[in-house]
From Swiss-Prot:
This is Pancreatic secretory granule membrane major glycoprotein GP2. GO terms for molecular function: antigen binding. It comes from Homo sapiens (Human). Disulfide bonds join C48-C59, C63-C157, C85-C172, C107-C145, C113-C177, C138-C146, C190-C200, C194-C209, C211-C241, C229-C320, C261-C284, C401-C461, C422-C477, C466-C473. One of its GO terms (biological process) is innate immune response.
Length: 537
């Protein structure tokens, strides 16, 4: 796979510390051929890493990979302002805006361009088709137009502009200077600088950047799609102008690995178009790969001109890797045992809270299926997360978590694991890892059974959304608080999980709250719960 098409994109999310996105090769496949087009060599119009380094084989077109410099102070007519220096510049740059779009080709007076010694290009700029050319940039000082000098690379790009590879300056204060543009030129009529694939045109008396009509390219590697790995969807963005150059016109059809997941490309800013894929294991035939640290979603975006494929198909393979946490692990599970609750907070919108059962202390491996079957010594991990809403302001608090022998959350037989936001201190197997500190809460408990021939255990948690700006969210627990009266529970804010049964027991015979005639004969060693004990805590 040519490294030219590799691109890493970071996406800062409230609920993820890091999102790693990898865009694989975009390949055009002609009818009857399944092999992607490979780049066998790189010409003079591509910039590659230094020979002998790991980046030696990484090449790209600087006309499509540069930093915009919209800095009016670089104008050769500017004789005011503080004295700046470009010593720390490194990479490919394009000058835009009122200050000018090209470096000066003649010696510039000292103390112009907001610097002491202005730098100018000694020679003429290359023409389109010349590729990347080597030039000398000179700095005017002490009566010498080339008192300091350094090498720069320049390339002429489609669209009538140049890009420059600048690696600092020989001294300070030196700065690269540009010739201000003529305000009457067409380029100045567009508020934003047009990209190489665009031209500045007037449509209905309004100037803007539109796709060039003369684009005709067979180089699929110039497409360079962009990838945005979001919390709920993956977005692939493609340059609309370059699609047109590859023969894919306005009515292009897009579909993922599941042909039923098809749609017309959505229009983005600056002549880009996009298609989204949900971050779900079973959606649109996503391929889900999972290791110890990440869940990786893969799919392929196919672009064609018609449902009847006669010409070119453009396939874009993409993947997003998400660090595993509670939320990502639930998305990656096909059938997690999970409970959801919509909660409205006056003046702050609607929130979604989810609670699930996990198999380990990392809370990244949820139980799946219809029920959980555990051995005697098993520890059950319970995690809850505030998924939707203002998680920067509201913290999730588990006020009361309790077990019942039936699925009825109002069952009189209750064993409290958490009461009044504090853990049951009489049960040494209960560990509350987090409660009220963030948008997540989690606790663990060794499993048990109820006396009285009940086969099943159900878990229930009453939640509270705590406004961290106006409330003390983290519980302050003491033994006197733990022994307080039985709390009043708001059943409208209770999440339910279960049933849970002991491994080796008969199939659950109770789903409606009626005890099975074939109940457990021996209580699990953790605790033997009776109706009386349920109310003692």
């Amino acid at each position: 796979m040519p490294h030219l098409m590799e691109r890493m994109v970071g996406s800062g999310l409230l609920w993820l510390a890091l999102v790693s996105c990898i865009l694989t090769q975009a390949s055009a496949v002609q009818r009857g051929y399944g092999n992607p087009i490979e780049a066998s060599s790189y010409g003079l119009d591509l910039d590659c890493g230094a020979p002998g380094t790991p980046e030696a084989h990484v090449c790209f077109d600087p006309c499509q990979n540069y930093t915009l410099l919209d800095e009016p102070f670089r104008s050769t007519e500017n004789s005011a302002g503080s004295q700046g220096c470009d010593k720390n510049m490194s990479g490919w740059y394009r000058f835009v805006g009122e200050g000018g779009v090209r470096m000066s080709e003649t010696c510039v007076q000292v103390h112009r361009c907001q610097t002491d010694a202005p730098m100018w290009l000694n020679g003429t700029h290359p023409a389109l088709g010349d590729g990347i050319t080597n030039h000398t940039a000179c700095a005017h000082w002490s009566g010498n137009c080339c008192f300091w000098k350094t090498e720069v690379l320049v390339k002429a790009c489609p669209g009538g502009y140049h890009v420059y590879r600048l690696e600092g300056t020989p001294w300070c204060n030196l700065r690269y200077c540009t010739v201000p543009r003529d305000p009457s030129t067409v380029e100045d009529k567009c508020e934003k600088a047009c990209r190489p694939e665009e031209e500045c045109l007037a449509l209905n008396s309004t100037w803007g950047c539109f796709c060039r009509q003369d684009l005709n390219s067979s180089d699929v590697h110039s497409l360079q799609p962009q990838l945005d790995c979001g919390p709920r969807e993956i977005k692939v963005k493609v340059d609309k102008c370059l699609l047109g150059g590859l023969g894919l016109g306005e009515e292009v059809i897009a579909y993922l690995r599941d042909p039923n997941c098809s749609s017309i490309l959505q229009t983005e800013e600056r002549n880009w178009v996009s298609v989204t894929s949900p971050v779900q294991a079973s959606a649109c035939r996503n391929i889900l790969e999972r290791n110890q640290t990440h869940a990786i979603y893969k799919n392929t975006l196919s672009l064609v001109n018609d449902f009847i494929i006669r010409d070119t198909i453009l396939n874009i393979n993409f993947q997003c890797a998400y660090p595993l946490d509670m939320k990502v692990s639930l998305q990656a599970a096909l059938q997690p045992i999970v409970s959801s609750l919509n909660v409205s907070v006056d003046g702050n919108g609607e929130f979604i809270v989810r609670m699930a059962l996990f198999q380990d202390q990392n809370y990244t491996n949820p139980y799946e299926g219809d029920a959980v079957e555990l051995s005697v010594e098993s520890v059950l991990y319970v995690g809850a997360i505030l998924e939707q809403g203002d998680t920067s302001r509201f913290n999730l608090v588990l006020r009361n978590c309790y077990a019942t022998p039936t699925e009825d959350k109002a069952d009189l037989v209750k064993y409290f694991i958490i009461r009044n936001s504090c853990s049951n201190q009489r049960d040494s197997t209960i560990h509350v890892e987090e409660n009220g500190q963030s948008s997540e809460s989690r606790f663990s408990v060794q499993m048990f059974m109820f006396a009285g021939h009940y086969d099943l255990v159900f878990l229930h948690c009453e939640i509270h959304l705590c406004d961290s700006l106006n409330e003390q969210c983290q519980p302050s627990c003491s033994r006197s608080q733990v022994r307080s009266e039985v709390p009043a529970i708001d059943l409208a804010r209770v999440l339910d999980l279960g049933p849970i049964t002991r491994r080796g027991a008969q199939s659950p015979g109770v789903m409606n709250g009626t005890p099975s005639t074939a109940g457990f004969l021996v209580a699990w060693p953790m605790v033997l719960l009776t109706v009386l004990l349920a109310w003692l805590f």
